[in-house]
Curated annotation (Swiss-Prot):
Biological role stated in the UniProt entry: Multifunctional RNA binding protein that plays a role in RNA metabolism and DNA maintenance. Participates in the resolution of DNA stress and the maintenance of genome integrity by localizing to sites of DNA insults. Also plays a role in proper nucleolar organization by limiting nucleolar size and regulating nucleolar number. Mechanistically, regulates the nucleolar levels of fibrillarin and nucleolin, two key players in pre-rRNA processing and ribosome assembly.
Location(s) in or outside the cell: Nucleus, Nucleolus; Nucleus; Cytoplasm
Chief localization: nucleus
GO MF term (any one): rRNA binding
Subunit structure: Interacts with KIAA1191.
Top-level taxonomic group: Eukaryota
UniProt-recorded name of the protein: Nucleolar protein 12
Gene that this sequence comes from: NOL12
């Protein structure tokens, strides 16, 4: 007796799924590993360059602000020196005496002594006489303050140096690989001309034996 096959209704049938692959995209995916790797390296190098430019821009702005600050301090010091020059001025007083035969003019010159009132912070004459040479030596030894040449932020310079080092490392990888390949090619030993196969040696030994007999 044969098996009774149950007839399925049209609603119960499952729809077939047909998968179609794009051969070009499939081939590109399977063979494009090196291409994608090179693209990732290029993107990383571009990102490092962009970050390096930003850090250098920050460093330039910081140095510019330091220069402006130093300029303002120097201008303020010059203004203070001008004010002191105006204060240290000489006052002259003239008195004329008329006589029948000649005229006498008495002029009194008095300087404004700021050291007496301790306005300038200068030492007294007794102290100045004893410590004259020492003050000259100390004034000669004092270094002049120069404009800042380097950034005061060490972290910023460290970031720039690390970014440049990574950029050079990425660019030198290809050169190192090429050099290694060239070195391997040069170190390969050429096959020796005197090397013979086993069959060749057997033939030679056989000929030697026959010639000896």
């Amino acid at each position: 007796m044969g098996r009774n096959k149950k007839k399925r209704d049209g609603d119960d049938r499952r729809q077939r799924l047909i998968l179609s692959f794009d051969e070009e995209k499939r081939r590109e995916y399977l063979t494009g590993f090196h291409k994608r790797k090179v693209e990732r390296k290029k993107a990383a190098i571009e990102e490092i360059k962009q970050r390096l430019k930003e850090e250098q821009k920050k460093l330039r702005e910081e140095r510019h602000q330091e220069y402006l600050k130093m300029l303002a301090e120097r201008e303020e010091a010059l203004e203070e020196a001008d004010e002191l020059d105006r204060l240290v001025t000489a006052k002259t007083e003239s008195v004329q005496y008329d006589h029948p035969n000649h005229t006498v003019t008495v002029t009194t010159i008095s300087d404004l002594d700021l050291s007496g009132a301790r306005l300038l912070g200068l030492p007294t004459p007794e102290q100045g006489a004893g410590s004259g040479p020492e003050e000259e030596v100390s004034s000669m030894e004092k270094p002049t303050r120069a404009l800042p040449r380097k950034s005061r932020d060490p972290l910023l310079s460290q970031r720039i140096s690390s970014l440049t080092a990574s950029l050079h490392a990425h660019s030198r990888k290809k050169v190192k690989k090429k050099r290694l390949r060239r070195a391997q090619d040069t170190t390969k030993k050429p096959p020796s001309a005197t090397r013979t196969s086993k069959t060749r040696r057997r033939r030679l030994t056989g000929k030697a034996r026959h010639s000896g007999e």
